């Protein structure tokens, strides 16, 4: 979920669910708004601007979402506000013509089995 928006248009989130923060940098996301989906990408400070003495792993305080907005007001015009849901862009696929891969596939199959 969108938790905080900076004056210069970067979005910080709260985690909901089992996503690992370590995989977030460079991942594409969908921000779900009342106006529709807004595309974004998780950013992480570049290696040449990080303090290498305390080079820490990505965490919710160091990663952010960039939707290409120049400031907070432009994000608001896109419909983005605190509380908007953010999801990874993902696709269902078949590996080696035998294995199904997809986000939360285990939960979805489990839900289907319970419903049956």
Question: What are these model-derived regions, one by one?
Answer:
Residues 1-116:
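N-terminal hydrophobic/helix-forming segments and targeting peptides
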